[in-house]
């Protein structure tokens, strides 16, 4: 937070518990906060505690994610909230971005596909795993941090664990760092990823991927609107 305050970061994304004092601090330097939520109850709590907008993390999102359908999540939040609303969860194409907006989101949150870009500070093996994998290769588990999230099956297997027989985690074992002993850790050894990566077939620059999203968005809009 000291670094964010020093540089007056305009948009701060928060997660795993909305905090009044954090929101007030960001507002003091003129910034806004967007809070990750996995259901309507957490969305309401975030706004009550001063968050400016909501990131609705639906089923299929990379890393920590919820179980709700994106349609159910967006529609319940939109019933009472007209502020900034971003949808996250398996969004990897321009058509999916358009679908998010049609469902009621102001913006779409695209994450996992950027792991496979040239600029991403990720191991080459991680990038290749994203390229080689699809929705069937994503495992939803709370073992690694105590909070449910989506991870690449291959990274779990490479850590010597059985992706189909993982023990349950608990909140008192929350560990989000990559430092530590030889035990497998999220996110150093167990790689997060969303279910939308099936469309990622190569590494490319971030700019070219953004251009691709824009082209796909325009094509999908033309297909739906007939223009």
Each language-model region and where it sits:
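Active-site entrance/lid segments in N-terminal catalytic domains of soluble metabolic enzymes
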Residues: 1-80, 84
């Amino acid at each position: 937070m000291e670094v964010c305050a020093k540089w007056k970061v305009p948009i701060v994304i928060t997660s795993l518990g909305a905090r009044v004092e954090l929101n007030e601090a960001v507002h003091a330097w003129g910034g806004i906060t967007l809070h990750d939520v996995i259901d309507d109850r957490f969305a309401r709590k975030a706004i009550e505690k001063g968050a400016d907008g909501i990131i609705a993390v639906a089923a299929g999102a990379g890393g920590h994610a919820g179980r709700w359908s994106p349609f159910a999540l967006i529609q319940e939040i939109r019933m009472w909230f007209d502020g900034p609303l971003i949808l996250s969860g398996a969004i990897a194409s321009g058509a999916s971005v358009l679908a998010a907006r049609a469902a009621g989101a102001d913006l779409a949150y695209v994450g996992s596909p950027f792991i496979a870009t040239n600029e991403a500070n990720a191991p080459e093996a991680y990038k290749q795993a994203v390229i080689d994998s699809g929705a069937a290769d994503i495992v939803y588990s709370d073992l690694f941090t105590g909070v449910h999230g989506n991870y690449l099956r291959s990274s779990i297997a490479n850590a010597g664990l059985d992706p189909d027989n993982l023990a349950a985690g608990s909140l008192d074992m929350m560990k989000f760092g990559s430092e530590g002993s030889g035990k497998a850790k999220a996110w150093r050894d167990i790689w997060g990823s969303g279910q939308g990566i099936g469309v990622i077939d190569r590494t490319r620059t971030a700019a070219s991927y953004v251009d691709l999203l824009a082209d796909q968005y325009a094509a999908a809009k033309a297909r739906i609107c007939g223009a």
